[in-house]
Regions:
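Short, small-residue-biased leader/transition segments that mark boundaries at the very start
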Residues: 1-8
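Alpha-helix C-terminal capping/helix-to-coil transition sites in glycosyltransferase folds
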Residues: 3, 34-35, 78
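Short internal beta-strands
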Residues: 6, 64-67, 231-234
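Thiamine diphosphate
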Residues: 17, 21-23, 30, 74-84, ...
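Phosphate/diphosphate-binding loops
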Residues: 22-73, 259
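Structural motif
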Residues: 38, 151, 202-204
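Flexible, glycine/charged-enriched surface loops at secondary-structure junctions
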Residues: 100-114, 299
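Active-site diphosphate/adenylate-binding microenvironment
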Residues: 114-189
């Protein structure tokens, strides 16, 4: 059971949830995609960020594809069984025909990958040895401070991947993201909308310095509407996702990715929005508590490691079982 973008409710804690598929997803689900005998895809478009090299993707598996749009069937990956319709109806109908089964050996096969990923990626990200804040530890700290009950909104880039990996949920309908569409600037207006749609819940949006500046004027909307958006800026002074590719595949030839940033504290003040900048983990918890306790909008600028990377990563053109754990 793996989920590229549908991650809400108690799915993050369910014992059969083995993590996230995709280029920056979890190690086990990606590797075992090329080992499973049956692959059930629900509302999935089999985009290249999930499949990696198509010629080697799940060739051993019988693929069952649930979707409401017939154009998605066989578009990228050949389907053995197609089930068309609203998934609320089709899944309910199919599950009535199933008998309980226990595939413990298959479930246990994920453990070795979980242990490797924990050691090589997750622990260093959430508990870094260096002085600089990591993106992952900021995301997890906000998640825990909101008791995993907040609505998560993401922009695009490394902030999106880190949010998907380390933010947890205890309620349904808890994530708003543009998936693989690459819509930098999406986060801020989407978060404003979420506060109107669910005024009873805390809305946290994670953004990078590149994405925030693409829709910075929406701070005016927040000021005017008094939208209680909790904005977390992961500021690394780079267009981080592109910089990571330039570092890994182009010998660190950084072209148009270093950012010259304004003073976000002064900008927030100009919009009459409370704000705080943190540069050390000793400051982080107190600043997050202040953000959550503030009645209204708040901008938390976390100055994170400038050249942090999102791992694991399936290299461009590589197979899903060739994930890299380090640069």
């Amino acid at each position: 059971h793996s989920f590229p973008t549908r991650r809400s409710s108690d799915l993050t804690n369910h014992p059969l949830n083995k993590g996230m598929l995709g280029m920056h997803g979890n190690l086990g689900p990606n590797i075992n995609t090329n080992k499973c005998d049956v692959l059930i895809a629900v509302g999935m478009r089999f985009d290249d960020r999930v499949t990696g090299k198509l010629e080697t993707y799940a060739k051993q598996a019988k693929i069952i594809h649930f979707d409401i749009d017939p154009a998605e069937i066989d578009k990228n990956v050949k389907t053995d069984v197609a089930v068309l319709g609203d998934c609320k109806e089709t899944l309910a109908a199919v599950t009535q025909l199933l008998e309980p089964a226990n595939h413990q050996e298959w479930i246990d096969s994920f453990r070795q990958y979980e242990e490797v990923e924990e050691e090589k990626v997750i622990r260093p990200e959430l508990h870094p040895a260096g002085k600089a804040l990591s993106m992952g530890e900021v995301v997890r700290a906000v998640s825990e401070a909101t008791h995993n009950e907040a609505i998560l909104v993401t922009d695009v880039g490394q902030n999106q991947m880190m949010s998907a990996r380390y933010f947890k949920y205890s309620k349904e309908r808890s994530i708003v993201t543009s998936g693989g569409l690459g819509t930098m600037g999406f986060g801020l207006p989407a978060a404003i909308g979420a506060t109107f749609g669910r005024p009873d819940r805390t809305v946290c949006v994670f953004m990078g310095d590149g994405g925030l500046q693409m829709n910075l004027q929406e701070l005016g909307t927040i000021m005017e509407q008094k939208a209680p958006v909790k904005m977390i800026l992961l500021n690394n002074n780079f267009l981080g996702n592109v910089r990571q590719w330039q570092a890994m595949f182009f010998n660190r030839r950084y072209s148009f990715t270093p950012m010259m940033n304004p003073d976000y504290m002064k900008i927030a003040s100009a919009y009459d929005i409370p704000a705080r900048r943190v540069m050390t983990r000793e400051e982080l918890a107190k600043a997050i508590d202040e953000m959550i306790a503030t009645d209204g909008p708040f901008l938390l600028e976390a100055c994170v490691e400038e050249e942090g990377n999102v791992m694991p990563m399936t290299p461009p053109g590589g197979s899903v079982n060739q994930m890299l754990l380090e640069c």
